[in-house]
Design a protein with these regions (language model features):
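Positively charged n-region of N-terminal signal peptides that target proteins for export
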Residues: 1-4
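Compositionally biased regions
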Residues: 6-7, 156
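Bacterial N-terminal signal peptides
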Residues: 7-16
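Functional surface patches built around histidine and acidic residues
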Residues: 21-502
Length: 502
């Protein structure tokens, strides 16, 4: 008999390795037993290219095999795998977990039959024999980062720097933390591939630290670490048992949206309303993932979320997407919420509408699986509901940003406004953000220094993206804003031109 756990993003108990001094980033000592070595050889024969052996994954697999031998109801459930990985000091975000039960002499053949021929860079096998039956767990992981040593246990109030290097082809690492109370913190990142990010652990409890990186398929989780502060448990809080998966797709999607809104409610946020046009975009991407057999934000047959929304004529200011895969739609959503960066998307304060799409499929092993896409959007803001004009709101946003930066306020300049307005009209006509000699025309007003920022935005407040607002050399500013639909950038866009001079 074989069972497969396939949670992915796009994630008798053995004692943890010694708490004091236990660090991620160092492979612990764990030599495979004779039975484990035979099973591992079957893995290396089945998976090509043959994965390397990870002692940390071996230890985690042994804990899970012991759970299976003891009669645990769901021995390789996602939460159990996550806790076993933490106890074994493995930072793999979502390894595939396969459970095989067979007579000891039949283990290699049973393992070979059970594996779905995935790709993997590292593997670990754990085996426990009980009453003539071998319980074998195989963990297969695609590693995306190499971490420097980082503590698994810290004191409340401790600080530590997470550092490491992304593996090719990944870049632009960014680190997120979910605090014990559910707050998500964006701790910063780097252009990559090397990174070093200082982290703080202000209180006791279970912290989840995540490294997200940009890959060929968009952002992916590169590493996931559980850090216990003040002696906290490495196990995640128990979740309420999910209801059986509804047979029809729409009901499953509605259940995920309800779960998403329940999480928002626990954090004091208003619910997002169902948006059928967004759900249609989400469902098509879930189907594309199922057809490709992989979890990713970008696929050859399905571009990034922004392009998909624009192609469907859906106006939005900002869009946030989660993708995941698991045995059921709610399990996939729970896997997404276990990721700090994905949870941050669920908790976006400006999001007001959302669409959920799923696609059911079967893994190579024959096990059923569900591909999930969640898209939350912030509405566009053309300024129509404000007593201020879009131009005035852009100036107001620039004033606020200058004050936040501790810089002198900018003076509005009517001559510069006229130049910026003409530039914005020109951009809308050509459907292309370009400066078109605007800085030279500003210098023609007998100014010594000029710079220009132009962009297409979903609202006046997006003007804080203006790169030159932080330059203390500038004292005057001109703003031009024109609203309209764009074939390239979507509906209800604002073309914004900002020109700065001394």
């Amino acid at each position: 008999m074989a069972r497969l756990s396939s949670a992915a993003l796009v994630l008798a108990v053995l004692p943890a390795l010694a708490g004091a001094g236990a660090e991620y980033g160092r492979e612990p000592a764990a030599a495979p037993t004779r039975l484990e070595a035979r099973a591992l050889e079957a893995v290396r024969t089945r998976v090509r290219p043959a994965p390397g052996t990870s002692p940390a994954l071996v230890l985690a697999a042994r804990e899970l095999a012991a759970r299976a031998a003891s009669g645990a109801r769901e021995p390789i459930a996602r939460a159990a795998v996550r806790a076993a990985l933490a106890r074994a000091l493995a930072s793999d975000p979502s390894p595939a977990a396969v459970l095989v039960e067979a007579a000891p002499d039949e283990v290699p053949a049973a393992v070979a039959r059970a594996l779905p021929r995935p790709s993997a860079t590292h593997a670990g096998v754990g085996a426990v024999e009980r009453d003539g039956t071998a319980f074998v767990v195989v963990l297969l992981s695609e590693r995306r980062a190499r971490l420097d040593p980082f503590p698994r246990e810290v004191a409340p109030g401790a600080q530590a720097a997470l550092s490491g290097t992304l593996l090719a082809p990944f870049s632009r690492p960014r680190v997120f933390i979910t605090r014990p109370g559910g707050e998500v913190v964006d701790a910063g990142g780097a252009a990559g591939p090397a990174f070093r990010v200082p982290l703080e652990f202000p209180g006791a409890g279970r912290h989840v630290v995540e490294v997200v990186a940009e890959g060929e398929g968009g952002p992916e989780v590169a590493a996931l670490l559980t850090v216990a502060a003040g002696g906290a448990s490495l196990d995640a809080p128990a979740r309420t048992a999910a209801a059986p998966e509804p047979a029809d797709r729409s009901s499953s999607e509605a259940g995920v949206l309800a779960a998403l809104n329940a999480t928002r409610a626990r954090h004091g946020l208003a619910p997002v309303t169902a948006a059928p046009e967004v759900a249609a975009v989400a469902r098509r991407h879930a189907e594309a993932m199922a057809a490709a057999g992989r979890v990713a934000h970008v696929l050859p047959a399905s571009p990034d979320a922004g392009a998909r929304l624009r192609g469907a004529g859906v106006p939005y200011r900002r869009a946030y997407e989660n993708v995941a895969r698991a045995g059921t739609a709610l399990e996939a959503h729970a896997a997404a919420e276990d990721s700090p960066a994905h949870l941050a998307n669920v908790l976006r304060t400006g999001a007001t509408r959302a669409g959920v799409g799923i696609a059911r499929a079967r893994l190579a092993s024959g096990d059923p699986t569900v591909y999930l896409t969640e898209i939350l959007i912030e509405p566009t803001d053309d300024g129509a509901a404000s007593p201020l004009t879009p131009d005035a709101r852009v100036r107001e946003a620039l004033w606020r940003e200058r004050a936040r930066l501790g810089l002198a306020p900018l003076t509005a300049d009517a001559a510069l406004d006229a130049l910026a307005r003409d530039a914005a009209e020109h951009m809308r006509t050509r459907d292309e953000p370009e400066t078109d000699g605007l800085a030279d025309r500003a210098l023609g007003l007998r100014r010594r220094l000029a710079a220009v920022d132009v962009f297409v935005a979903g609202g006046p407040d997006d003007a804080v993206r203006s790169a030159n607002v932080k330059d203390a050399r500038f004292a005057r500013v001109g703003v031009g804003v024109v609203a309209g639909d764009s074939a390239r950038f979507g509906k209800a866009r604002l073309w914004i031109a900002v020109v700065y001079t001394d």
